[in-house]
Amino acid sequence: MELGYHYPSKYGDEQHLPMIVMNGLLGGFAHSKLFTNVRENAGLAYTISSELDLFSGFLRMYAGINRENRNQARKMMNNQLLDLKKGYFTEFELNQTKEMIRWSLLLSQDNQSSLIERAYQNALFGKSSADFKSWIAKLEQIDKDAICRVANNVKLQAIYFMEGIE
């Protein structure tokens, strides 16, 4: 099952970093709400995650589920986003997510495809993303209110469910 959402943030604007953190809290890491609540606690999915495309304004939640869990899983997935909109997450979860993003950024500095992608983005947008200290300082400033603001701009656009024939 896939749930597709639109949000008005674009690459490089002031909502860029809060959206990255919000996605991390939602489904970007193993400690995320989708993974912890839908997969681990409720056992409704064998795989679950969310992905963010900062260039198109598209957020995707996806889950591998059994068809009989379809409605319950969809409702529970939506509830994880609603929890973020209402600020139902802890400072520990927020800090853990920011730490994971920091480590991902540091690891990307030693990855050829990440370096090529970053050079392409710099050429395309005329901006330099190489100032990691500044980027991390901005990341540290993101708080619960910033997450709630960006989460409240996320709107459901499409639901896709594919099932086989028995």
Model-derived features with residue positions:
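Short amphipathic beta-strand starts and helix->beta connectors
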Residues: 41-48, 143-146
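Short acidic (Asp/Glu) and glycine-rich catalytic loops that position anionic groups and cofactors
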Residues: 1-2, 14-18, 54-59, 75-78, ...
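Hydrophobic alpha-helical scaffolding
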Residues: 11-12, 24, 28, 63, ...
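C-terminal regions of mature proteins
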Residues: 97-166
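Short beta-strand-to-loop capping motifs
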Residues: 5-7, 63-67, 163-164
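His/Glu-based metal-binding/catalytic segments typifying zinc-dependent metallopeptidases
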Residues: 1-33, 42
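Buried hydrophobic packing residues in well-ordered domains
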Residues: 3, 20-22, 38, 61, ...
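M16/insulysin-pitrilysin zinc metalloprotease superfamily fold
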Residues: 49-108
